Amino acid sequence: MSHSVTDSTVLLGHGSGGQMMKRIIDEVFLDAFGSPELLEGNDAGVAALPASGRIAMSTDSFVVSPQFFPGGNIGRLAVCGTVNDVATSGANVRYLSCGFILEEGYPMDRLRQIVQTMAETAHEAGVSIITGDTKVVERGGADGVYINTAGVGEVPTGVALSGANCRPGDVILVSGTLGDHGIVIMSQREGLAFSSTIESDAAPLNHLIADVLAAAPGTRCFRDPTRGGLASTLNEFAQASNVAMEVDEDAVPVRPDVQAACEMLGYDVLQVANEGKMVAVVPAEQADAALSAMRAAHYGENAAIIGRVLPLAEGARPAVRVRTGWGSTRILDMLVGEQLPRIC
């Protein structure tokens, strides 16, 4: 019996290695992604090495629940997350791989929508999906669809970004409002309704990073504050660089509805996940240039300078503190435990 992707759901045969698998690859994945390397049909995508001789590579797996949410779906996350991770090295992101684990019975129209979103987001980021894999597990063996992506980029000569580069006197910037993605996922999962529409911030930020590096070549580091939010990112920087950091709470951009939701749920917005924001640490003399570049870039219009890097007091441990609007300070710790499982 011949099957095709006119089937309304994913079947075990779509992962069999036979005719059904070839059809889902050809008619769902290749039709959407269609890079020359992928269309060759080999077990590996072959790509040119950069002239600089250095590459950056990252991989990430995506299990978000729900898989569709305001502002995106698991496919957009799968591209943006890995593109942004590679881009934090200062690399020009070039190629992605993608691996799908599909549950038997998953609706085919939803899979097509996810794949099409991935193709559109990859195009927006200027990257090619050059290799991939598909597996199908029995009903109950997965929750619909899981996606793994890996990315490769070319690191320009002379670029050496690292969370260990932060120095006292440096300035901390963020590219936009915090907490949007985490609150969207929580509201969708728990059936919470808000008076305004909050959308995930999932976005590819490789072009924004390139613009900031061009304007502020002394930039120390970038990082996307995903799980654990800004709190985890800054604590990681402080520990890697053996410094202290101070954040001006009033300077941190947060949507009023997101702030209200965090207060209602008992969350610290600085610990809530983001999927389309970037944290940068730059020398003080380049801070204005970096901020202008962020605000001029797509997805950076709400960028702000939010804090500074401080020297450690004698005998003190690396730490992050927040200066509140009341003039007091509090320690900003990394998230303890799991605030919201399957956020990405």
Cite the ranges covered by each PLM segment.
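Active-site-proximal betaalpha loop/short-helix elements
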Residues: E103-G105, I198-N274
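N-terminal amphipathic/basic leader segments beginning at the initiator methionine
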Residues: M1-V28, G315-R317, T329-L340
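Short amphipathic alpha-helices in soluble, non-transmembrane regions
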Residues: A289-Y299
